[in-house]
């Protein structure tokens, strides 16, 4: 029976990538092709001696096999044995990084599957962040979220890998929540998922993200808002360059500001209605003495006039908006 290794799926140029210099390439070629060639020669020698007896052929074959094994380089004692080639953990990590950068997830998965499962080899592999990150990437793209969570929760990653791993952590939980609810998640749903499944400290440095803009940025946004509460995309891009924000952040700030101003206008309208003629009469009914209970027509009509004028100005987009009444310290 002929045993075919999983690494037979890969071509020789893939198994000898650019990270190996000429010296290491010769070593790897000697340990693979050179060794097999030497063994084949010994076997042929044993076969030619078959006329002298079966024992001679067997001895020749054994000698050939021994000759092939003696070609292993002595400096590779720290390497672990793969089915056909000797790779150090650093070289395996380099292969994983290359495949991850190129986006060849299918080939990356096959390569990881072909790695040895011996306890000593696994321990050496798990010390390399690139290999662990590659396992997490494959688990995410194959939908094996349980393995993804296990890798991310039980291994400490450096800050350079946090962004990508955090995105996979959140997206995996989003997909599970969508599958459970049977519908796409909205912003509020995603917020609840993030609260329910916070980032593990292995991929998060504990620093809270702040959405508070600097005073200069908020001042500039307010000035533009007073000029035009509904900026077009070109103005958003221009304002984004001036403030250092993204066009999306600028659009969100204007949207939130308009919502706050509408809420403030509605609150003011209710207050004006409460102090109108009916409100004054309701205060006078219990017998409380009031001065000037007879209201002049101009005074009685003033709240209505102010509300209507405010409505007209809001419709035309030229209302004089308050800068401090509905402004907040933190804007998203």
Curated annotation (Swiss-Prot):
Compositionally biased tracts (Polar residues): 316-332
Keyword set, alphabetical order: Developmental protein, Disease variant, DNA-binding, Holoprosencephaly, Homeobox, Nucleus, Repressor, Transcription, Transcription regulation
Keyword hit for Transcription: yes
DNA-binding region: 206-265
Region feature Interaction with TLE5, mapped onto this chain: 72-119
Reported effect, residue 37 to C: In SCHZC and HPE2
A GO cellular-component term linked to this record: transcription regulator complex
Highest taxon in the source lineage: Eukaryota
Low complexity biased stretches: 293-309
PROSITE patterns xrefs: HOMEOBOX_2 (PS50071)
Stretches for region Bind to RHO promoter: 232-234
Disulfide bonds: none
Disordered: annotated span: 232-251, 258-332
Self-association state and partner proteins as the record states: Interacts with EYA4; translocates EYA4 from the cytoplasm to the nucleus and promotes activation of their target genes. Interacts with MTA1 and HDAC2; represses its own transcription. Interacts with MTA1; facilitates the binding of SIX3 to the core DNA motif of SIX3 promoter. Interacts with EYA1; promotes EYA1 translocation to the nucleus. Interacts with TLE1 and TLE5 (via Q domain); can act in combination with either TLE1 and/or TLE5 leading to transcriptional repression or activation, respectively.
UniProt record similarity statement: Belongs to the SIX/Sine oculis homeobox family.
Record's protein name: Homeobox protein SIX3
Gene: SIX3
């Amino acid at each position: 029976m002929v045993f075919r290794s999983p690494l037979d799926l890969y071509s020789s140029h893939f198994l000898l990538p650019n990270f190996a210099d000429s010296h290491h390439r010769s070593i790897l070629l000697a340990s693979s092709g050179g060794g097999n060639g030497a063994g084949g020669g010994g076997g042929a020698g044993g076969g030619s001696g078959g006329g002298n007896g079966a024992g001679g052929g067997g001895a020749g074959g054994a000698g050939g096999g021994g000759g092939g094994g003696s070609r292993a380089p002595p400096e590779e004692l720290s390497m672990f044995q793969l089915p056909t080639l000797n790779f150090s953990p650093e070289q395996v990590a380099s292969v994983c990084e290359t495949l991850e950068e190129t986006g060849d997830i299918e080939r990356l998965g096959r390569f990881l599957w072909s790695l040895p499962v011996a306890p000593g080899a696994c321990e050496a592999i798990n010390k390399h962040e690139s290999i662990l990150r590659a396992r997490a990437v494959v688990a995410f793209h194959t939908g094996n979220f349980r393995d993804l969570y296990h890798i991310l929760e039980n291994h400490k990653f450096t800050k350079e890998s946090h962004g990508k791993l955090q995105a996979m952590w959140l997206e995996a939980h989003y997909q599970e929540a969508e599958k459970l609810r049977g519908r796409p998640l909205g912003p509020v749903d995603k917020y609840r998922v993030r609260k329910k499944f916070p980032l593990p400290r292995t991929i998060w440095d504990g620093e809270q993200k702040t959405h508070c803009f600097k005073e200069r940025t908020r001042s500039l946004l307010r000035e533009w808002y007073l000029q035009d509460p509904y900026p077009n995309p070109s103005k958003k891009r221009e304002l984004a360059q001036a403030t250092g924000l993204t066009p999306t952040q600028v659009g969100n700030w204007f949207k939130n500001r308009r919502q706050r101003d509408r809420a403030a206008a509605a609150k003011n309208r209710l207050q004006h209605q409460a102090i109108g003629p009916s409100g004054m009469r309701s205060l006078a009914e219990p017998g409380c003495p009031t001065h000037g209970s007879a209201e002049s027509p101009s005074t009685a009509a003033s709240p209505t006039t102010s509300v209507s004028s405010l409505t007209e100005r809001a419709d035309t987009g030229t209302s004089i908006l308050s800068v401090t009444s509905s402004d907040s310290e933190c804007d998203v």
